[in-house]
Amino acid sequence: MEIKDNAFSRQFETLLDGKLISVEYSFQEKKIFLTRINVPDGFENEEYITELLNNIMAIAYERKFKVVPILPKIAAFFRKNPKYRDLLPPGIKI
């Protein structure tokens, strides 16, 4: 899965079978706030979202960002994937 950081739209995005799947974000002081997941009908499968989030975590490591999970679904991703907990800012407990 190839992920594009569309800074203009403030979202990480990918195309699957010609359909756009994205995670919207806002950015502040080396923290990225993941604010919304956009998944078209037929792509609600957790595998797609998990793969997209795994790729976003790789980008966060590369850019030395901390990740603030605003959505319950993204907080659940952190609980299921404790290897990414070091990306959480100090004081954020999941």
Regions found by a protein language model. Name each.
Residues R10-I21:
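Conserved beta-hairpin
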Residues M1-Q11:
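Active-site rim helix/loop that mediates acceptor-substrate recognition in acyltransferases
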Residues F27-T35:
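A conserved beta-turn-beta hairpin within the catalytic core of GNAT-like acetyltransferases
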Residues N45-L53:
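Glycine-rich acyl-CoA binding loop
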Residues N38-E44:
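A short, internal acetyl-CoA/4′-phosphopantetheine-binding micro-motif in the GNAT/acyltransferase core
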Residues E2, S22-E24:
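Short, surface-exposed charged micro-motifs
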Residues I59-I94:
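C-terminal structural segments of small proteins and small subunits
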Residues I56:
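Aromatic/hydrophobic pocket-lining residues that form π-stacking "cages" and hydrophobic walls in ligand
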